[in-house]
Amino acid sequence: MKAFLGVEFQLVCCAYFLSYKTLRIFLAALSGFMYFRMNNLHKEDMNFKKIVAVDETLLNEAALEQLKTIGEEVVVYHDFPTEEEEVIRRIGNADCLLVSFRTPIRRSVLDACPNIRYIGMCCTLYYPESSNVDVIEARKRGITVLGVKDYGDEGVVEYVVSELVRLLHGFGNVRWLEESTELTGRKVGIIGLGKTGGMVAEAMRFFGAEVLYYSRTRKPEAEAKGIAYRPLADLLTEAEIICTCLPRNNYLLGEPEFALMGDRKILVNTSVGPTFEVDALKKWLGTCKHSYYLCDATGMGVVRDALKDIPNVLYTPYISGKSIQSVERLSQKALANIRTFLSEVPQV
Protein backbone atom coordinates (compact mmCIF):
# COMPACT_ATOMS: atom_id res chain seq x y z
CA MET A 1 0.00 0.00 0.00
CA LYS A 2 2.78 2.40 0.91
CA ALA A 3 4.58 1.47 -2.27
CA PHE A 4 1.41 2.09 -4.28
CA LEU A 5 0.89 5.50 -2.64
CA GLY A 6 4.51 6.33 -3.32
CA VAL A 7 4.09 5.55 -7.02
CA GLU A 8 0.79 7.46 -7.14
CA PHE A 9 2.40 10.49 -5.50
CA GLN A 10 5.25 10.35 -7.99
CA LEU A 11 2.79 10.17 -10.90
CA VAL A 12 0.83 13.17 -9.60
CA CYS A 13 4.03 15.16 -9.16
CA CYS A 14 5.17 14.17 -12.64
CA ALA A 15 1.82 15.21 -14.17
CA TYR A 16 1.93 18.50 -12.32
CA PHE A 17 5.50 19.14 -13.44
CA LEU A 18 4.64 18.35 -17.06
CA SER A 19 1.58 20.59 -16.94
CA TYR A 20 3.63 23.43 -15.49
CA LYS A 21 6.36 22.96 -18.07
CA THR A 22 3.79 22.80 -20.88
CA LEU A 23 2.15 25.93 -19.58
CA ARG A 24 5.48 27.73 -19.51
CA ILE A 25 6.21 26.65 -23.08
CA PHE A 26 2.75 27.76 -24.15
CA LEU A 27 3.09 31.12 -22.44
CA ALA A 28 6.55 31.64 -23.94
CA ALA A 29 5.24 30.82 -27.40
CA LEU A 30 2.28 33.13 -26.91
CA SER A 31 4.55 35.90 -25.72
CA GLY A 32 6.79 35.45 -28.74
CA PHE A 33 3.83 35.49 -31.09
CA MET A 34 2.42 38.65 -29.51
CA TYR A 35 5.82 40.37 -29.67
CA PHE A 36 6.18 39.40 -33.33
CA ARG A 37 2.67 40.58 -34.12
CA MET A 38 2.97 43.87 -32.28
CA ASN A 39 6.40 44.49 -33.75
CA ASN A 40 5.09 43.96 -37.26
CA LEU A 41 2.05 46.10 -36.59
CA HIS A 42 4.44 48.79 -35.35
CA LYS A 43 6.49 48.47 -38.50
CA GLU A 44 3.36 48.75 -40.61
CA ASP A 45 2.42 51.92 -38.77
CA MET A 46 5.97 53.23 -39.23
CA ASN A 47 5.87 52.91 -43.01
CA PHE A 48 4.19 54.91 -45.70
CA LYS A 49 1.79 53.26 -48.11
CA LYS A 50 3.11 55.25 -51.06
CA ILE A 51 6.00 57.69 -51.42
CA VAL A 52 6.11 59.98 -54.47
CA ALA A 53 9.04 62.22 -55.39
CA VAL A 54 6.99 64.46 -57.64
CA ASP A 55 9.93 66.15 -59.38
CA GLU A 56 13.75 66.14 -59.46
CA THR A 57 14.53 66.29 -55.76
CA LEU A 58 18.26 65.55 -56.25
CA LEU A 59 18.17 62.67 -53.76
CA ASN A 60 21.00 60.29 -54.59
CA GLU A 61 20.61 56.61 -55.45
CA ALA A 62 21.47 55.45 -51.94
CA ALA A 63 18.70 57.61 -50.50
CA LEU A 64 16.20 56.42 -53.10
CA GLU A 65 17.02 52.83 -52.12
CA GLN A 66 16.45 53.73 -48.47
CA LEU A 67 12.99 55.02 -49.35
CA LYS A 68 12.04 51.48 -50.36
CA THR A 69 12.53 50.36 -46.76
CA ILE A 70 10.01 52.89 -45.43
CA GLY A 71 7.45 52.91 -48.22
CA GLU A 72 5.40 50.00 -49.55
CA GLU A 73 5.43 51.72 -52.95
CA VAL A 74 7.96 54.31 -54.14
CA VAL A 75 7.55 56.37 -57.31
CA VAL A 76 10.32 58.76 -58.35
CA TYR A 77 10.22 61.39 -61.11
CA HIS A 78 13.32 63.11 -62.48
CA ASP A 79 11.72 66.01 -64.32
CA PHE A 80 9.51 68.98 -63.46
CA PRO A 81 5.77 68.92 -64.15
CA THR A 82 4.57 72.06 -65.90
CA GLU A 83 0.85 71.74 -65.21
CA GLU A 84 -0.97 71.34 -61.91
CA GLU A 85 -3.03 68.50 -63.35
CA GLU A 86 0.18 66.56 -63.89
CA VAL A 87 1.30 67.26 -60.32
CA ILE A 88 -2.01 65.89 -59.03
CA ARG A 89 -1.81 62.85 -61.30
CA ARG A 90 1.69 62.03 -60.09
CA ILE A 91 0.84 62.34 -56.41
CA GLY A 92 -2.43 60.41 -56.63
CA ASN A 93 -3.12 58.52 -53.41
CA ALA A 94 0.37 58.97 -51.95
CA ASP A 95 0.65 59.64 -48.23
CA CYS A 96 4.27 60.87 -48.46
CA LEU A 97 5.22 63.63 -50.92
CA LEU A 98 8.78 64.71 -51.68
CA VAL A 99 9.26 67.91 -53.67
CA SER A 100 11.98 70.38 -54.67
CA PHE A 101 11.75 74.18 -54.51
CA ARG A 102 10.44 74.38 -58.07
CA THR A 103 7.05 72.63 -58.13
CA PRO A 104 4.12 74.51 -56.56
CA ILE A 105 2.00 72.51 -54.12
CA ARG A 106 -1.03 74.72 -53.73
CA ARG A 107 -4.23 74.29 -51.77
CA SER A 108 -5.91 72.85 -54.86
CA VAL A 109 -3.29 70.08 -54.96
CA LEU A 110 -3.92 69.29 -51.29
CA ASP A 111 -7.66 69.18 -52.01
CA ALA A 112 -7.13 66.69 -54.84
CA CYS A 113 -4.70 64.49 -52.87
CA PRO A 114 -6.30 63.98 -49.43
CA ASN A 115 -4.08 61.04 -48.41
CA ILE A 116 -0.97 63.20 -47.96
CA ARG A 117 0.19 63.22 -44.35
CA TYR A 118 3.84 64.21 -44.84
CA ILE A 119 5.51 66.65 -47.24
CA GLY A 120 9.29 66.48 -47.36
CA MET A 121 10.72 69.59 -48.98
CA CYS A 122 14.08 68.66 -50.47
CA CYS A 123 15.19 72.25 -50.17
CA THR A 124 15.38 74.96 -47.54
CA LEU A 125 12.12 76.06 -45.94
CA TYR A 126 12.85 79.67 -44.95
CA TYR A 127 9.38 80.96 -44.19
CA PRO A 128 5.96 79.43 -44.92
CA GLU A 129 4.98 82.58 -46.82
CA SER A 130 7.88 82.29 -49.29
CA SER A 131 7.59 78.56 -49.94
CA ASN A 132 6.41 76.84 -53.11
CA VAL A 133 4.34 74.62 -50.79
CA ASP A 134 1.25 76.06 -49.14
CA VAL A 135 2.72 75.25 -45.75
CA ILE A 136 0.12 77.13 -43.74
CA GLU A 137 -2.79 75.31 -45.38
CA ALA A 138 -1.01 71.95 -45.13
CA ARG A 139 -0.41 72.35 -41.41
CA LYS A 140 -4.04 73.35 -40.89
CA ARG A 141 -4.93 69.94 -42.31
CA GLY A 142 -2.55 68.14 -39.97
CA ILE A 143 0.04 67.54 -42.69
CA THR A 144 3.62 67.71 -41.46
CA VAL A 145 5.92 69.81 -43.67
CA LEU A 146 9.67 69.66 -43.08
CA GLY A 147 12.47 71.30 -45.05
CA VAL A 148 16.22 70.78 -45.27
CA LYS A 149 18.79 73.46 -44.48
CA ASP A 150 22.55 73.96 -44.56
CA TYR A 151 23.38 71.55 -47.35
CA GLY A 152 24.50 73.61 -50.37
CA ASP A 153 26.05 76.73 -48.84
CA GLU A 154 29.66 75.68 -49.37
CA GLY A 155 29.23 75.42 -53.13
CA VAL A 156 27.43 78.77 -53.28
CA VAL A 157 30.29 80.49 -51.47
CA GLU A 158 32.84 78.92 -53.83
CA TYR A 159 30.77 80.17 -56.77
CA VAL A 160 30.71 83.73 -55.42
CA VAL A 161 34.46 83.76 -54.87
CA SER A 162 35.31 82.19 -58.23
CA GLU A 163 33.05 84.47 -60.29
CA LEU A 164 34.25 87.60 -58.54
CA VAL A 165 37.89 86.64 -59.05
CA ARG A 166 37.24 85.98 -62.76
CA LEU A 167 35.54 89.35 -63.20
CA LEU A 168 37.98 91.38 -61.12
CA HIS A 169 41.05 89.91 -62.81
CA GLY A 170 39.54 89.47 -66.26
CA PHE A 171 40.17 85.73 -66.35
CA GLY A 172 36.99 85.32 -68.38
CA ASN A 173 35.73 87.37 -71.33
CA VAL A 174 35.29 90.62 -69.40
CA ARG A 175 37.04 92.61 -66.69
CA TRP A 176 35.33 94.92 -64.23
CA LEU A 177 37.83 97.79 -64.32
CA GLU A 178 40.49 98.82 -66.81
CA GLU A 179 43.15 97.02 -64.78
CA SER A 180 43.11 93.77 -62.86
CA THR A 181 42.20 94.14 -59.19
CA GLU A 182 42.06 91.91 -56.14
CA LEU A 183 39.35 91.44 -53.56
CA THR A 184 41.83 92.85 -51.06
CA GLY A 185 40.68 96.25 -49.86
CA ARG A 186 37.41 96.18 -51.81
CA LYS A 187 34.21 97.04 -49.99
CA VAL A 188 31.78 94.13 -50.10
CA GLY A 189 28.23 94.55 -48.83
CA ILE A 190 26.20 91.50 -47.80
CA ILE A 191 22.42 91.87 -47.75
CA GLY A 192 21.05 89.12 -45.51
CA LEU A 193 23.48 87.70 -42.97
CA GLY A 194 22.01 84.25 -42.50
CA LYS A 195 23.97 81.03 -43.03
CA THR A 196 24.96 81.72 -46.65
CA GLY A 197 25.49 85.43 -46.11
CA GLY A 198 27.65 84.76 -43.08
CA MET A 199 29.80 82.29 -45.00
CA VAL A 200 30.21 84.73 -47.91
CA ALA A 201 31.21 87.43 -45.43
CA GLU A 202 33.86 85.17 -43.89
CA ALA A 203 35.22 84.27 -47.33
CA MET A 204 35.47 87.94 -48.29
CA ARG A 205 37.27 88.72 -45.03
CA PHE A 206 39.72 85.91 -45.76
CA PHE A 207 40.64 87.62 -49.04
CA GLY A 208 41.13 90.95 -47.30
CA ALA A 209 37.92 92.70 -48.31
CA GLU A 210 36.22 95.24 -46.07
CA VAL A 211 32.88 93.63 -45.31
CA LEU A 212 29.65 95.49 -44.56
CA TYR A 213 26.25 93.97 -43.96
CA TYR A 214 22.57 94.83 -43.81
CA SER A 215 20.05 92.58 -42.07
CA ARG A 216 16.63 92.95 -40.48
CA THR A 217 18.30 92.27 -37.15
CA ARG A 218 21.74 93.29 -35.96
CA LYS A 219 24.35 90.54 -35.62
CA PRO A 220 26.62 91.36 -32.64
CA GLU A 221 28.74 88.24 -33.17
CA ALA A 222 29.50 89.32 -36.75
CA GLU A 223 30.21 92.89 -35.72
CA ALA A 224 32.66 91.59 -33.12
CA LYS A 225 34.64 90.11 -36.03
CA GLY A 226 34.81 93.45 -37.82
CA ILE A 227 31.82 92.99 -40.15
CA ALA A 228 30.25 96.43 -40.00
CA TYR A 229 26.50 97.07 -40.02
CA ARG A 230 25.07 99.64 -42.41
CA PRO A 231 21.50 100.72 -43.09
CA LEU A 232 20.47 99.50 -46.54
CA ALA A 233 20.77 102.90 -48.24
CA ASP A 234 24.26 103.44 -46.85
CA LEU A 235 25.39 99.95 -47.82
CA LEU A 236 24.17 100.36 -51.40
CA THR A 237 26.00 103.67 -51.71
CA GLU A 238 29.22 102.61 -50.02
CA ALA A 239 29.83 99.02 -51.15
CA GLU A 240 31.46 98.27 -54.51
CA ILE A 241 30.36 94.63 -54.55
CA ILE A 242 26.88 93.79 -53.25
CA CYS A 243 25.76 90.24 -52.58
CA THR A 244 22.11 89.44 -51.86
CA CYS A 245 21.66 86.34 -49.69
CA LEU A 246 17.92 86.45 -49.04
CA PRO A 247 15.06 83.99 -48.64
CA ARG A 248 12.97 83.25 -51.68
CA ASN A 249 10.58 85.94 -52.98
CA ASN A 250 12.28 88.83 -51.17
CA TYR A 251 12.30 91.69 -53.68
CA LEU A 252 14.43 94.28 -51.98
CA LEU A 253 15.92 96.27 -54.87
CA GLY A 254 13.88 98.63 -57.02
CA GLU A 255 14.68 101.81 -58.96
CA PRO A 256 15.44 103.91 -55.84
CA GLU A 257 17.92 101.30 -54.59
CA PHE A 258 19.67 100.96 -57.95
CA ALA A 259 19.90 104.75 -58.17
CA LEU A 260 21.78 104.72 -54.86
CA MET A 261 24.20 102.12 -56.20
CA GLY A 262 25.28 104.10 -59.25
CA ASP A 263 27.88 102.81 -61.72
CA ARG A 264 30.92 100.56 -61.35
CA LYS A 265 29.17 98.18 -59.01
CA ILE A 266 28.83 94.40 -59.01
CA LEU A 267 25.60 92.75 -57.86
CA VAL A 268 25.79 89.05 -56.98
CA ASN A 269 22.65 87.08 -56.18
CA THR A 270 22.83 83.81 -54.23
CA SER A 271 19.09 83.71 -53.49
CA VAL A 272 16.47 81.43 -55.00
CA GLY A 273 15.02 83.67 -57.70
CA PRO A 274 15.45 87.42 -58.17
CA THR A 275 15.81 89.85 -55.28
CA PHE A 276 14.99 92.86 -57.46
CA GLU A 277 12.41 94.33 -59.78
CA VAL A 278 13.39 93.09 -63.24
CA ASP A 279 12.71 96.36 -65.08
CA ALA A 280 14.68 98.29 -62.48
CA LEU A 281 17.68 95.97 -62.88
CA LYS A 282 17.52 96.23 -66.68
CA LYS A 283 17.41 100.02 -66.50
CA TRP A 284 20.39 100.08 -64.12
CA LEU A 285 22.48 97.79 -66.29
CA GLY A 286 21.52 99.72 -69.41
CA THR A 287 22.56 103.02 -67.86
CA CYS A 288 25.59 101.83 -65.88
CA LYS A 289 27.74 100.11 -68.49
CA HIS A 290 30.52 99.28 -66.02
CA SER A 291 28.22 97.46 -63.61
CA TYR A 292 27.50 93.74 -63.63
CA TYR A 293 24.93 91.28 -62.39
CA LEU A 294 26.23 87.80 -61.49
CA CYS A 295 24.01 84.81 -60.80
CA ASP A 296 23.65 81.08 -61.34
CA ALA A 297 20.60 79.14 -62.53
CA THR A 298 18.99 79.41 -59.10
CA GLY A 299 19.50 83.16 -58.87
CA MET A 300 18.15 83.78 -62.36
CA GLY A 301 14.94 81.88 -61.78
CA VAL A 302 11.96 82.72 -63.96
CA VAL A 303 13.51 85.96 -65.28
CA ARG A 304 16.14 84.17 -67.36
CA ASP A 305 14.67 85.06 -70.73
CA ALA A 306 14.39 88.72 -69.76
CA LEU A 307 18.04 89.02 -68.71
CA LYS A 308 20.18 86.37 -70.39
CA ASP A 309 21.10 88.45 -73.46
CA ILE A 310 22.15 91.61 -71.59
CA PRO A 311 25.95 91.98 -72.03
CA ASN A 312 26.69 92.84 -68.41
CA VAL A 313 24.67 89.94 -67.02
CA LEU A 314 27.15 87.15 -66.26
CA TYR A 315 24.94 84.09 -66.01
CA THR A 316 26.18 80.64 -65.05
CA PRO A 317 23.59 78.06 -66.20
CA TYR A 318 24.27 75.69 -63.32
CA ILE A 319 23.11 75.36 -59.72
CA SER A 320 26.14 76.48 -57.74
CA GLY A 321 24.95 74.72 -54.60
CA LYS A 322 24.80 71.34 -56.33
CA SER A 323 27.79 69.04 -55.80
CA ILE A 324 28.51 65.47 -54.74
CA GLN A 325 28.85 66.64 -51.16
CA SER A 326 25.74 68.83 -51.11
CA VAL A 327 23.60 66.10 -52.68
CA GLU A 328 24.80 63.69 -49.99
CA ARG A 329 23.99 66.19 -47.23
CA LEU A 330 20.59 66.89 -48.77
CA SER A 331 19.81 63.19 -49.10
CA GLN A 332 20.80 62.34 -45.54
CA LYS A 333 18.87 65.25 -44.05
CA ALA A 334 15.76 64.51 -46.11
CA LEU A 335 15.84 60.90 -44.90
CA ALA A 336 16.41 62.04 -41.31
CA ASN A 337 13.32 64.24 -41.54
CA ILE A 338 11.24 61.31 -42.75
CA ARG A 339 12.48 59.08 -39.94
CA THR A 340 11.81 61.84 -37.43
CA PHE A 341 8.22 62.08 -38.63
CA LEU A 342 7.69 58.32 -38.56
CA SER A 343 9.25 57.81 -35.16
CA GLU A 344 7.82 61.01 -33.66
CA VAL A 345 11.14 61.56 -31.94
CA PRO A 346 12.24 65.23 -31.93
CA GLN A 347 15.29 65.79 -34.13
CA VAL A 348 18.39 66.86 -32.22
Segments from the language model and where they lie:
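NAD(P)-binding Rossmann-fold cofactor-contacting core
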Residues: F206-E223
